[in-house]
A protein has these predicted regions:
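Conserved GNAT acetyl-CoA-binding A-motif
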Residues: 107-119
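A short beta-loop-alpha structural element at the N-terminal edge
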Residues: 4-18
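Acetyl-CoA-dependent GNAT
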Residues: 7-11, 23, 29-89, 100-102, ...
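Conserved active-site alpha-helix within GNAT-family acetyltransferase domains
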Residues: 93, 97, 109, 122-140
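Terminal substrate-recognition subdomain of acyl/acetyltransferases
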Residues: 151-162
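Conserved catalytic-core motifs of GNAT/GCN5-like acyltransferases
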Residues: 117-120, 132, 137-153
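Conserved beta-strand segments that form the floor/walls of ligand-binding pockets within enzyme
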Residues: 55, 67, 81-85, 94, ...
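Compositionally biased, non-globular sequence tracts
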Residues: 17, 26, 103, 111-113
Length: 162
């Protein structure tokens, strides 16, 4: 398996859109069904400072994505927020772990980020386990955090500090 974690390129945008068009990736994120290519092009062709979009490429195909966003407030520049998705067909193969390793390396060894935050639905045990494996702890739970498939879902706030 030749897995590469790298910064995204503009030609990755259709593959990133396809990741979030998958049922599991949609259910685990805040993305809406049927994501448009135009929306993803707008989002990823105008990446602001402090945002580092990463992709996981397996044998030439983009199969995962992680957004790493450093807080804009000067008093919180030591904090980053992450969100990630892995194509349904490639879940359970270590893609999420590889993306997380790269994000932590970027945070701690290059950007002086000492706190990484994320939000995860409480009914996503695989993602919660992944984050806990990398030292994330649940700091709280938001009731009715999002609306998905006709009902409200709760989410955990998780963070990792060094």
């Amino acid at each position: 398996m030749s897995l590469i974690i790298r910064q995204y390129h503009a030609d990755d945008i259709p593959a990133i859109r396809d990741i979030y068009a998958q049922p599991k990736a949609q259910a685990g994120t805040l993305q809406l069904p049927m994501p448009s290519l135009a929306m993803w092009e707008k989002r990823l062709n105008n990446v602001p400072d402090g945002v580092y979009p990463l992709v996981a490429e397996l044998e030439g195909k983009v199969v995962g994505n992680l957004g790493f966003v450093i807080a804009a407030n000067p008093r919180r520049r030591h904090v980053a927020d992450i969100g990630m998705g892995v194509h349904d067909a490639y879940q359970g193969r270590g893609i999420g772990s590889a993306l997380m390793e790269k994000a932590i390396d970027l945070a701690e060894n290059w950007l002086n980020v000492s706190r990484i935050e994320l939000t995860v639905y409480t009914d996503n045990p695989a993602a919660i386990h992944l984050y806990q494996k990398f030292g994330f702890e649940i700091e709280g739970t938001a009731k009715q955090f999002a609306f998905r498939n006709g009902e409200f879902v709760d989410a955990h706030y998780m963070a990792r500090t060094r």
